[in-house]
């Protein structure tokens, strides 16, 4: 009997039907050994000896593997064709050797295949190789690095920053990206700018729009028109001028298809087009690779999904070209196949790109046989694969340059049409933060043709901060920086969310306060180890180990000597020094530019500063113990914000009533006090919440009060002198009114939930000098 060992039962089931009765295919159910989560699993002083354990969960599977291996003439290790798969095979072989006293490595045969089809499986079994110790060593080195960072840095975090959970080698760098982007957004100052649109009519009475580009031979830059007055003055002048078509430019533009999918581009495109998380994409892709029941048989529908290679096999290209010719015609088929080269930093090109194993299985032919989400992802992969071998898209571009009678003013109108749809016939790539304007046609125009100006429209704009990272754009950024590998992107994103370091809201990552604390600490005290270049450099070293160009324990020693010294150094630092640094680094985030926001909202004389307690970080008044105000900046599971110490509440959540849509409103108890919640939490989507101010007794909270709290920030009215709106809100430091972009604290003597417009204007008048100083 020949024993074949794979990772999963699904994969075993698919492969089993391709092999004869002499083979028995069983599953290891993933890794059978791992480093236990305790001190001493990696021993730097013993040349980085690694103490692996068989988990309780894996025990019964190991017993079955060992039992079957005793009866086998040979063991075929058929795990996935990457470092992780090689590592699983190595662990299986080591356990069998240990349990059965097998001495010869010839007993084990490594078989690797990129797709689970009969042809690929038979070829792999007929052409086995030995285990690649370089790949195994690279995986062991990665595992050791992650362990050494996690089990030395995390305990230090717990001591120096109570409430922080752990720090991972690669996850911490991804977290830094998210936090730094949030810093950019917080510090961003929006600037006003204007442009001028001209609604024009040609001699055939057809309308089109042009944009003003030059005034008196001066090109208009983004900030040439900076306010409404400038824009209106220019608009008035333009209305008195007549325009004509000065010059028409026509050209064609070719657009080439994107390469077939690799792991990162599949995750990005599935996020954009399908709304899938990276984790969900990989779970579905795994199933499509391992085998799906399509009625008459179970078959692997796509090639291996963890890859950074963009190549396709010659056989696959031939099949794709044949289908293009048959289904779309020869005009959609280039004269020669398209060959792609990877743009990914340090791409291994070890595997093919992700493609269907049989291109003739069209999405339509499988629609009734696949789960809805399976179908969507398969369709995406199929279309991208077909498109990558199709002809270019050809665009006709037209630029009409317009001029006033003396050429004092110049304008431009652009138009584009698709002359030949090429690969667009099948597939278009999505963009993360931009939209293309296509088929924006101009009416027929002639040079020197007089035009009528139907309208001159000034358009106000404001510069916008950089967007928060989506899953797609974060994976793209990690890939550009050379951080992580195809097998790690999904887990990086999942771990950050599981640790509550980031939240995913409206499909964008927002750092939680806990995540910002960790990032500030690591950047301040372990800067080298969260540098992007350093982390990418470690990935390069792991690649070199996999290629047999670097000894893995030498790489570990090089890392550990510096990292351990850094740990010992920070261990000696006083917590007060660390708190001082963290507060300084978070000062802008916590208080903004306004120094007055540091004043305690309770006593109005003390100053707020960062403190650390056993439950995490909080702000406290410098007048303690006379003033006991405190405000948590790291929320618990309920993620509510509240000032003051939590008051006593009944253990049960209280239903106050329902809103106008019939959604229940709860008064709930959190670790930092009571809060209002709209509806129940479903999955990871957080319902709307509002803290109950310390000035309110929770026993007096009515449905009316709860609805008011949930409605904040709320418009009070319009200031009679400026026609600017006045808003009331409740923030980190209590109630406030917002007027002309400035914030004014509402003192305790006011009932802020029922603040009148007159009282609001009175507060503004009292703070007039401060507001003018800020605006100056």
Curated annotation (Swiss-Prot):
It is an enzyme of class 5 (isomerase). Residues 132-568 form the Topo IA-type catalytic domain. Transmembrane segments: none annotated. It catalyses: ATP-independent breakage of single-stranded DNA, followed by passage and rejoining. It holds the Pfam family Topoisom_bac. GO terms for biological process: DNA topological change. A zinc finger (C4-type) spans 600-627. Mg(2+) binds at residues 7, 80. Its EC number is 5.6.2.1. The keyword Iron-sulfur does not apply. GO terms for molecular function: DNA binding; DNA topoisomerase type I (single strand cut, ATP-independent) activity; zinc ion binding. Gene3D superfamilies: 3.40.50.140, Bacterial Topoisomerase I, domain 1, Topoisomerase I, domain 2, Topoisomerase I, domain 3, Topoisomerase I, domain 4. The record marks 31, 142-143, 146, 158, 306, 499 as: Interaction with DNA. Residues 166-171 are annotated as: Interaction with DNA. Belongs to the type IA topoisomerase family. This is DNA topoisomerase 1. The gene is topA.
């Amino acid at each position: 009997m020949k024993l074949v060992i794979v990772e999963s039962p699904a994969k075993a089931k698919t492969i089993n039907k391709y092999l004869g009765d002499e083979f028995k295919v069983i599953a290891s159910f993933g890794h059978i050994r791992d480093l236990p989560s305790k001190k001493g699993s990696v021993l730097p002083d013993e040349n980085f000896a690694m103490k692996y354990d068989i988990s309780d969960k894996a025990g019964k599977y190991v017993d079955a593997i060992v039992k079957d291996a005793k009866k086998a003439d040979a063991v075929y290790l058929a795990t996935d064709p990457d470092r992780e798969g090689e590592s699983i095979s190595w662990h299986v072989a080591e356990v069998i050797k240990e349990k059965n006293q097998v001495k010869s490595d010839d007993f084990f045969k490594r078989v690797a295949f990129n797709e689970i089809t009969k042809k690929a499986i038979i070829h792999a079994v007929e052409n086995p190789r030995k285990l690649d110790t370089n790949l195994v060593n690279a995986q062991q080195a990665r595992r050791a690095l992650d362990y050494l960072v996690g089990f030395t840095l995390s305990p230090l975090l717990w001591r120096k920053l109570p409430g922080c959970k752990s720090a991972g080698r690669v996850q911490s760098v991804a977290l830094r990206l998210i936090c730094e982007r949030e810093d950019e957004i917080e510090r961003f100052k929006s600037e006003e700018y204007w442009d001028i649109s001209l609604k024009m009519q040609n001699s055939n009475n057809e309308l089109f729009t042009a944009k003003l580009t030059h005034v008196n031979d001066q090109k208009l830059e983004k900030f040439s028109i900076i306010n409404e007055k400038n824009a209106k003055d220019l608009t008035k002048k333009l209305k008195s001028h007549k325009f004509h078509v000065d010059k028409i430019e026509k050209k064609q533009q070719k657009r080439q298809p994107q390469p077939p999918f690799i792991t990162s581009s599949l995750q990005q495109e599935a996020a954009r087009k399908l709304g899938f998380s990276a984790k969900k994409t990989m779970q579905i892709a795994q199933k499509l690779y391992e085998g799906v029941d399509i009625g008459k048989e179970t078959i692997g529908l796509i090639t291996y999904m963890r890859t950074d290679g963009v190549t396709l096999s010659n056989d696959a290209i031939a099949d794709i070209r044949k289908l293009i010719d048959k289904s779309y015609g020869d005009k959609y088929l280039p004269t020669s196949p398209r060959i792609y080269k990877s743009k990914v930093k340090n791409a291994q090109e070890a595997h093919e790109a992700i493609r269907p194993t049989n291109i003739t299985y069209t999405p339509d032919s499988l629609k009734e046989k696949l789960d809805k989400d399976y179908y969507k992802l398969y369709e995406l992969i199929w279309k991208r694969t077909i498109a990558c071998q199709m002809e270019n898209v050809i665009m006709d571009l037209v630029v009409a340059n317009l001029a006033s009678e003396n050429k004092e003013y110049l304008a431009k109108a652009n138009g584009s049409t698709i002359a030949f749809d090429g690969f667009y016939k099948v597939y278009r790539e999505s963009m993360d933060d931009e939209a293309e304007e296509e088929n924006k046609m101009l009416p027929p125009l002639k040079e020197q043709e007089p035009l009528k100006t139907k309208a001159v429209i000034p358009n106000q704009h404001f510069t916008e901060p950089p967007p928060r990272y989506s899953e797609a754009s974060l994976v793209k950024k990690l890939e550009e920086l050379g951080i992580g590998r195809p097998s790690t992107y999904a887990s990086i994103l999942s771990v950050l969310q599981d640790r509550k370091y980031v939240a995913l809201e409206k499909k964008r990552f927002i750092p939680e306060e806990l995540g910002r604390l960790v990032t500030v600490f690591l950047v301040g005290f372990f800067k080298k180890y969260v540098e992007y270049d350093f982390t990418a450099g470690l990935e390069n070293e792991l690649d070199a180990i996999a290629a047999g160009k670097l000894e893995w324990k030498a790489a570990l020693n090089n890392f550990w000597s510096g990292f351990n010294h850094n740990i010992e150094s920070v261990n000696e630092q006083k917590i007060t020094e660390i708190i001082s640094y963290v507060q300084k680094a978070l000062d802008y985030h916590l208080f903004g530019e306004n120094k007055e926001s540091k004043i305690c909202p309770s006593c109005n004389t003390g100053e707020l500063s960062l403190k650390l307690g056993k439950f995490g970080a909080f702000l406290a008044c410098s007048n303690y113990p006379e003033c006991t105000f405190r405000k948590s900046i790291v929320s618990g599971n309920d993620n509510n914000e509240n000032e003051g110490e939590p008051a006593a509440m009944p253990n049960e959540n209280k239903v106050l009533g329902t809103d106008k849509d019939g959604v229940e409103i709860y008064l709930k108890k959190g670790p930092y006090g009571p809060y209002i919640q709209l509806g129940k939490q479903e999955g990871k989507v957080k319902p709307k919440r509002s803290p109950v101010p310390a000035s309110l007794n929770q026993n007096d909270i009515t449905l009316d009060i709860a609805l008011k709290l949930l409605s904040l920030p709320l418009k009070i009215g319009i200031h009679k002198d400026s026609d600017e709106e006045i808003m009331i809100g409740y923030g980190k430091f209590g109630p406030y009114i917002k007027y002309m972009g400035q914030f004014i604290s509402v003192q305790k003597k006011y009932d802020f939930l029922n603040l009148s417009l007159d009282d609001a204007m009175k507060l503004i008048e009292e703070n007039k000098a401060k507001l003018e100083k800020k605006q100056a």
